[in-house]
């Protein structure tokens, strides 16, 4: 088994991305990261994605990741059992926040449960029409809002703008994923607003959201972000400006699951480098 496939397709990489995104939020708000929450996010992400990919039905097109999943379903089961066990222990440790964490877990489950080909889960495919915003909202909740709640950060105007900024970045990335998955969603009767739009309309929505992302970034620059922090904040948005054309024309698993997923954590990664090499 190639380690790079295990790292990306085994959901280790995306789990690390989630942790780095949370670290970025903690450090942006000048609070000490909660180690238990970071561990919870890592294992909860591993649980969610292992469950999601284990349920992913067969598709007609060739996919390197899907082939890997077929060949390693038993390994995904082990990853799921290990991660859900760790998540349960960490949920007990974080029991003061049990309600909000449980609600977040439920929202995440609903997203993946639509892949289960049995009633009542099939019904979920008909209502997740705002799939793009739904997924971006879950990521924003986990990586920005929950760190603020756990750290008891005041929901100031700057915090709200930062939350919107992160949502817009993630939403733009989700647009590309949903455009790629439109044929699979049609086959599986999953309602997907992006899949129903023409490419011209998708392009307008994509760059409109990127424009709002840059506007919110400038607003943060006027509210205490220094120039280095501002450049770190906008760098993934700059890369997304030049990534639209290739993203809609390729189905490369590495492009989507390494590059585009990595853009979600890029600001956090750069911020950590800034801290290590001030």
Give the role of each language-model region:
Residues 1-14, 58-79, 113-137, 192-204, ...:
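Interhelical loop and helix-boundary elements at the membrane-water interface
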Residues 1-47:
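Non-cleavable N-terminal signal-anchor transmembrane helices
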Residues 6-14, 20-22, 39, 162-172, ...:
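Hydrophobic alpha-helical transmembrane segments of membrane proteins
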Residues 15-20, 79-86, 134-146, 207-215, ...:
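Core segments of transmembrane alpha-helices
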Residues 19, 23, 41-55, 84, ...:
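Central hydrophobic cores of alpha-helical transmembrane segments in multi-pass inner-membrane proteins
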Residues 20-40, 87-100, 141-164, 216-229, ...:
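Helix-coil boundary and interhelical linker segments in multi-pass alpha-helical membrane proteins
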Residues 32-36, 80-118, 204-253:
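Transmembrane helix-loop-helix
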Residues 44-62, 170-193:
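Acidic (Asp/Glu-rich) catalytic motifs at the cytosolic membrane interface
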């Amino acid at each position: 088994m190639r380690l790079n496939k295990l790292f990306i397709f085994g959901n280790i990489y995306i789990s690390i991305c989630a942790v780095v995104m949370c670290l970025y939020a903690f450090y942006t708000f000048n609070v000490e990261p909660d180690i238990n929450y970071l561990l919870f996010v890592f294992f909860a992400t591993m649980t969610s994605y292992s469950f999601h990919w284990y349920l992913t039905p067969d598709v007609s097109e060739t996919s390197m990741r899907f082939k890997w999943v077929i060949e390693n379903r038993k390994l995904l089961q082990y990853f799921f059992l290990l991660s859900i066990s760790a998540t349960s222990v960490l949920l007990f440790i974080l029991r003061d926040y049990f309600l909000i964490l449980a609600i977040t877990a439920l929202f995440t489950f609903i997203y993946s449960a639509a892949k289960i080909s049995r009633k009542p889960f099939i019904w979920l495919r008909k209502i997740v029409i705002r799939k793009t915003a739904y997924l971006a909202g879950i990521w924003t909740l986990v990586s920005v809002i929950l760190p603020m709640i756990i750290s008891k950060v005041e929901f100031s105007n700057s915090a709200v703008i930062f939350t919107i900024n992160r949502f817009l970045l993630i939403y733009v990335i989700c647009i590309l994923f949903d455009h790629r998955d439109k044929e699979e969603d049609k086959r599986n009767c999953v309602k997907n607003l992006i899949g129903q739009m023409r490419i011209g309309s998708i392009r307008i929505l994509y760059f409109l959201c990127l424009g709002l992302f840059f506007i919110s970034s400038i607003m943060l620059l006027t509210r205490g972000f220094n120039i280095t922090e501002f450049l770190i904040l906008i760098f993934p948005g700059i890369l997304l400006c030049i990534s639209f054309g290739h993203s809609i024309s390729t189905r490369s698993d590495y492009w989507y699951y390494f590059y585009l997923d990595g853009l979600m954590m890029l600001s956090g990664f750069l911020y950590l480098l800034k801290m290590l090499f001030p």
